[in-house]
């Protein structure tokens, strides 16, 4: 039994706010923050938003801003969608109340990286969908703020499908499956095939250096490939090629991955020497694409 003094975890409360003016932003943000300030067993709310919206809140709240955290969204969302998952998990572990209790108002950078290309946008929609599963055990209350003037109608419509408080919400696994149904471009004919049953980190590092990666980046890329290969098991083959300034490795394991959360769940504490697998690859690569096939899978890592 959970007592009032000892709140239990869950469920994750994942909401969406769409606004098209400063007034509409404040009309949804201020009640949410008041709710968070009044919630028992919680630290003060945190707002991750565009600098202009943070200024609106400062002006509206005045001295009432108090201990509310105000974070420019370009500082929070400084990397990939997978990085944002790690950022959120780390913040909750360090700062949330019992069971993950905290109110977070979160505005992704749709005018920047998140909205810069259809591929990037797809990864952020995946992030929004999988958040419903990844954070399900926690009692966190998240309000995802969408400025329709910046995000645009297509992104807002896609995001509505990922938030349980909308009438068009869909199963996160269905959305992930839709995104993974988009075929990847075929590897180029001159892709380099790596010898052996598993790619050697040294060979990947040397190849990446020849392609122009700095030694430190080549080391990170080689480690990501090795970690992913170790997690995926026996490989049919591994290919390397350059895509503009980026280095790409495609791993072809002989078995399917069959896990839409692969690489998105932070690994548990492990003994020294044990790897972090696809989690590490997703954290350091620009993209990690997984496509299951009848006789195995294609797992493509793009660095840079």
Stretches with model-predicted labels:
Residues 1-185:
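Positively charged, polar, low-complexity stretches
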Residues 200-233, 270:
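Conserved short strand/loop->alpha-helix "switch" segment adjacent to the catalytic nucleotide/phosphoryl-transfer site
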Residues 73-81, 189-202:
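STAS-typified acidic loop motif
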Residues 132-135, 225, 232, 257:
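Amphipathic alpha-helical interaction surfaces in cytosolic regulatory modules
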Residues 230-304:
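Conserved beta-strand-loop-beta-strand hairpin that lines the nucleotide-binding pocket
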Residues 54, 58, 197, 201-205:
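An amphipathic alpha-helix signature
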Residues 26-30, 128, 197-201, 222, ...:
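Short, well-ordered alpha-helical scaffold segments within catalytic/effector domains
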Residues 182-191, 204, 209:
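Short, flexible active-site loops
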């Amino acid at each position: 039994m959970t007592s009032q003094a000892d709140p239990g975890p869950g469920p994750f409360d994942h909401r969406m706010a769409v606004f098209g003016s400063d007034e509409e932003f404040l009309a949804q943000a201020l009640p949410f923050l008041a709710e968070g300030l009044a919630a028992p067993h919680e630290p003060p709310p945190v707002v991750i938003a565009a600098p202009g919206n943070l200024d609106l809140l400062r002006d509206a709240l005045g001295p009432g801003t108090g201990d509310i955290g105000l974070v420019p969204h370009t500082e929070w969302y400084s990397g990939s969608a997978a990085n944002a998952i790690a950022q959120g998990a780390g913040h909750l572990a360090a700062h949330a109340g019992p069971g993950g209790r905290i109110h977070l108002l979160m505005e992704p950078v749709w005018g920047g990286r998140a909205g810069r290309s259809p591929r990037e946008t797809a990864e952020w929609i995946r992030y929004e969908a999988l958040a419903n599963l990844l954070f399900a055990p926690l009692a966190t209350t998240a309000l995802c703020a969408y400025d329709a003037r910046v995000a645009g109608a297509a992104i807002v419509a896609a995001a509505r499908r990922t938030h349980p408080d909308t009438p068009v919400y869909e199963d996160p696994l269905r959305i992930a499956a839709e995104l993974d149904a988009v075929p990847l471009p075929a590897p180029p004919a001159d892709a380099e095939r790596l010898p052996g049953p598993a790619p050697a980190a040294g060979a990947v590092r040397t190849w990446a250096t020849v392609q122009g990666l700095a030694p430190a980046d080549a080391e990170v890329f080689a480690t990501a490939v090795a970690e992913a290969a170790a997690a995926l098991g026996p490989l049919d083959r591994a290919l390397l090629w350059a895509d503009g300034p980026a280095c790409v490795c495609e791993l072809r394991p002989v078995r399917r991955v069959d896990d839409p959360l692969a690489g998105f769940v932070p690994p548990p504490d492990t003994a020294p020497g044990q790897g972090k697998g696809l989690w590490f690859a997703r954290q350091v690569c620009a993209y990690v694409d997984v496509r299951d096939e009848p006789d195995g899978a294609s797992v493509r890592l793009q660095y840079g």
